[in-house]
Regions:
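Proline-centered turn/helix-capping motifs that create local helix->coil transitions or kinks
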Residues: 104-110, 198-201, 280-283, 318-322, ...
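Alpha-helical coiled-coil oligomerization motifs
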Residues: 158-161, 202, 276, 283, ...
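Active-site-adjacent "gating/activation" loops or surface patches in catalytic cores
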Residues: 223-247, 251
Length: 448
């Protein structure tokens, strides 16, 4: 079977391709090859700018032509590299040979071809290409989508800022809150964790076969290759070079990024579960789309499937991010190859997260506030004003206020407005205090 949305093994590239296709520009095989070509070209240009003595003859006017190799990189170019790899059995060496072919097409570059990939090991290319792809995916896809989710939550938090709502701790009625405030909890958490993620530096390894610039230094000992590497990685790639490494990246900063993404996932899971619960409690109804079916057996069903879909995808993403975070920083001695296949899966959690965010947004935008259900719960739970009453009585030095309210409310009998009012009338306090207590209701006792 040919690969398409019906035959793909992963639902990211199958069922959910419409939601994840933008990520192909960062995490597909094509994208990885293109990023490698970009790094190799920019490295060659930077050697020319140094300049190495053997590269002084290159006219800087050719640099933009060289950059067009990756700017105009096509699927045919990527296939040519794959064809070369079928012979070399080495993906990065195939990129080098492809670039030598491209230099031949330009003409006049024959004397300079051996400075493609000069002094480098494959991981100098991989450990710059992959971080660059992650950085750009975060900036162009991930951050905007998380921020869109936050913006939607803020809209609801503002719209429903004054809606009183019965809180639930341990699944039981607790001091009332406001719906808008509870949504703002998720805004606050997401914003803080997103800021933490954005503060994580995206770093790259660039230092030769074992991280010491051995080949560079033996060929050109007169140059400060560490400074060269720092400048190249920062100015040409927008990354931060790891100063001390083995053959491969330390991956500590990538691990920090993945851990930060996990925390954001955790907040989103919590949010999706809460909205799922509010729908179950009938605090929200859902917009119904004509023609849709909620159950193959029960015609009446309108299920919170978007929140469930989001939760499931976030769980998968978190599991993969956890493996990335704990596995990548561990490699035998100066390196083993276990990071290679793991890095090829970096895009997978991004895919599941994008699916989850879009499902969350779809679910949120289907919500219809059901105020009667919210107010009914408040009206049926007058026991929650007990905290307010006993606190005011404490203020007034009333004897044993907590115990008095406990005796009234911690029973299996229904606590109603009338029973609370009756209790207030029986208190040995001034009329002003009784008036203050009468004003407290489940609708008004919502704090700040």
């Amino acid at each position: 079977m040919e690969l398409d949305v019906l035959t793909a093994i992963s639902p990211i590239d199958g069922r959910y391709r419409g939601k994840t296709k933008a990520l192909a520009a960062y995490f597909s095989e094509f994208a990885l090859i293109k990023y490698r070509v970009q790094v190799e070209v920019e490295y060659f240009i930077t050697l020319c700018e140094l300049p190495l003595p053997q590269l002084k003859g290159i006219d800087s006017g050719v640099f933009e032509t060289l950059r067009n190799i990756y700017r105009n990189f096509s699927e045919a170019d990527a296939q040519r590299i794959k064809d070369i790899e079928s012979v070399t059995n080495h993906d990065v060496k195939a990129v080098e040979y492809f670039l030598k072919e491209e230099f031949d097409k330009l003409g006049g570059m024959d004397d300079y071809k051996e400075f493609i990939h000069f002094g480098l090991t494959s991981q100098d290319i991989n450990n710059t290409s992959v971080p660059l792809s992650i950085k750009e995916a975060l900036e162009k896809e991930y951050y905007p989508q998380v921020e869109e989710l936050i913006a939607q939550l803020k809209t609801y938090a503002t719209e429903w800022a004054d809606i009183p709502m019965l809180a639930k701790t341990h699944g039981q009625p607790a001091s009332p809150t406001r719906l808008g405030k509870e949504i703002m909890v998720f805004v606050y958490r997401l914003e803080r964790q997103l800021a933490t993620l954005k503060a994580c530096p995206v770093t790259a390894k660039f230092g030769g076969a074992t991280g010491n610039y051995n080949a560079h230094h033996v060929a050109y000992p007169q140059y400060d290759w560490k400074q060269f590497g720092n400048r190249f990685v920062k100015e040409k790639l927008g990354l931060e070079r790891e100063e001390y490494t083995t053959q491969i990246s330390n991956y500590d900063n990538l691990s920090a990024i993945f851990d930060a993404m996990k925390r954001i996932n955790t907040v989103m899971i919590d949010m999706n579960r809460d909205f799922w619960q509010y729908i179950s409690m009938e605090y929200f109804k859902q917009k119904i789309k004509a023609g849709e079916v909620g159950s193959s057996a029960m015609p009446h069903k309108v299920n919170p499937i978007d929140f469930e879909n989001a939760e499931g995808n976030l769980g998968i993403a978190t599991s993969i991010l956890e493996h990335l975070a704990v596995k990548l920083p561990v490699s035998r001695l100066q390196r083993d190859l276990t990071d290679s296949t793991v890095l090829r899966n970096v895009g997978v959690p991004f895919g599941h997260i994008v699916i989850a965010i879009q499902s969350s947004l779809k679910g949120l935008r289907k919500l219809l506030l059901n105020e009667p259900a919210i107010y009914r719960d408040l009206d049926n739970c007058w026991s929650v004003v007990a905290e307010a009453i006993q606190t005011i009585l404490r203020r007034e030095a009333y004897p044993h206020p907590y115990e008095a309210l406990k005796a009234l409310t911690r029973t299996n009998q229904a606590i109603t407005e009338s029973s609370i009012k009756e209790f207030i009338e029986g208190l040995n306090v001034s009329e002003d205090i009784k008036k203050e207590l009468r004003a407290i209701t489940p609708h008004t006792y919502t704090g700040l």
